[in-house]
Regions:
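Conserved N-terminal boundary motif of the eukaryotic protein kinase catalytic domain
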Residues: 99-107
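Amphipathic alpha-helical interaction surfaces in cytosolic regulatory modules
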Residues: 18-91
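ATP-binding pocket architecture of kinase catalytic cores
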Residues: 106-107, 112-212
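Short, glycine/acidic-enriched loop or turn micro-motifs at the edges of active sites
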Residues: 18, 48, 162, 175, ...
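STAS-typified acidic loop motif
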Residues: 1-28
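Helix-rich C-terminal or lid/interface subdomains of diverse kinases
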Residues: 306-383
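An alpha-helical support segment within catalytic cores of ATP-dependent transferases
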Residues: 206-256, 260-261, 266-267
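Active-site Asp-x-Gly
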Residues: 266-317
Length: 383
């Protein structure tokens, strides 16, 4: 019987059949492994287990009474036995992930954190590039469901899958494409798509969330500000904190990364597929986080939009400004400046966390942040 001790977690690998004939020797072997190791969490990996009977279940009951145990990689057949006998309500039991091959799949969208593929005519798969933690992905799916039941047009996943050493989620979506692709493919409908984009943002930012478990983005910005405090002088740090303090707390949704690669078009309806940054808070945070990919990254790294979006920097900036004009119903440079101010807090933080070696971007964003902090005493944008 194989096992692995990783930190304070002991994983034991079971295989074959766990029935009345094998239960006693398997139980004895489990106790030998347990006795020889120091651990806090006990995990049973059942990827190679074909069947479990009531005798095997009784062994798990006895172990549960003594240890903090969980079960992972249970096949569908084995998981069904756990579910029918009520074990899934008393133990943490995870099904084995379905494995899929994307060798011949078409890429229909990509970003910093994920890539979206069309698996077949009915199904798309979002593959996570920077996390292999199923718990983090399950958290995003819970956030997506919260948005969906609140009336936000959100694509709901039906399966978590494994692609090599990466994880992904499947969505049933017919005849869909990213909003980025739709805009580039149907230039004659640019204004129509832009109007729908602005309406989607408005819908998100005016929909109240009653679930206290959804994170508050303002608290996240306080954390960002504390993290970059060593990069700011005292005067501008205190001014930035004062302006964050002045923003009214809201319980309306903020997507947090709603650029047009994270939106799908299906039958002319816009649907969100990337929900890991969902939170509640003031709409200025929504518009500030959009300034980053459309404009801010280009300021110290020309050509960034070409590489990330496949469009010219000036076109990305034009799209963002046109989007704000529709959102507010006017072209107001003061409102845009105040949004930029909040955006540069995010940008200094992003650079500090992800590309600390990029001194030019840090100095550029910090300099523009200082200028706006000196210019404005509030971040009121009329919302």
């Amino acid at each position: 019987m194989d096992f692995k001790l990783n930190g304070d977690t002991l994983t034991i690998y079971l295989e074959g059949e766990f029935n009345s004939y094998s239960a006693e020797p398997i139980e004895n072997e489990i106790h030998k492994i347990i006795k020889a190791n120091n651990f806090k969490k006990l995990v049973f990996d059942l990827e190679m287990l074909r069947y479990i009977s009531s005798a095997g279940l009784r062994v798990f009951v006895k172990l549960k009474q003594q240890y903090d145990i969980s079960i992972t990689n249970a096949s569908l057949e084995v998981y069904d036995i756990f579910q029918m006998t009520g074990f899934t309500s008393i133990m943490n039991i995870k099904k084995a992930l379905r494995k899929i091959d994307l060798k011949h799949a078409e890429v229909i969208g990509n970003g910093f954190f994920s890539t979206v593929y069309r698996l077949d005519k009915d199904t798309i798969v979002k593959v996570f590039n920077r996390t292999s933690d199923p718990g983090q992905i399950e958290r995003e799916l819970r956030l997506a469901k919260e948005a969906f039941v609140s009336g936000i047009p959100t694509a709901i996943s039906f399966d978590i899958v494994q692609i090599g050493d990466k994880l992904g989620v499947c969505f049933e979506m017919l005849d869909c494409m990213s909003l980025k692709t739709a805009v580039q493919t149907h230039l004659d409908r640019f204004q129509e798509y832009l109007n729908k984009y602005a309406a989607l943002l408005k819908k998100i930012n005016t929909t109240e969330c009653l679930n206290p478990a959804i994170p508050d983005i303002k608290k996240f910005y306080y954390e960002k500000l504390e993290k970059i405090k060593p990069n700011l002088d005292d005067k501008h740090y205190l001014k930035a904190k004062q302006l964050l303090d002045s923003l009214e707390d809201r319980k309306t949704f903020v997507h947090g990364d709603c650029h047009f690669k994270n939106i799908m078009v299906q039958h002319d309806e816009l649907l969100l597929i990337d929900m890991d940054t969902l939170s509640v808070g003031h709409p200025i945070f929504e518009l500030a986080t959009l300034y980053a990919p459309y404009c801010a990254f280009n300021e110290d790294d020309p050509g960034n939009s070409e590489r990330f979006f496949g469009i010219k920097d000036e076109d990305a900036s034009t799209l963002y400004n046109a989007l704000l004009n529709i959102y507010f119903g006017k072209d107001d440079p003061v409102i845009k400046d105040k949004i930029r101010l909040v955006a540069y807090i995010h940008m200094v933080w992003w650079n500090h966390v992800n590309t600390p070696e990029n001194k030019a971007r840090l100095e550029g964003c910090r300099g523009r942040l200082y200028k706006l902090l000196d210019q404005y005493d509030d971040v009121n944008i009329g919302l």
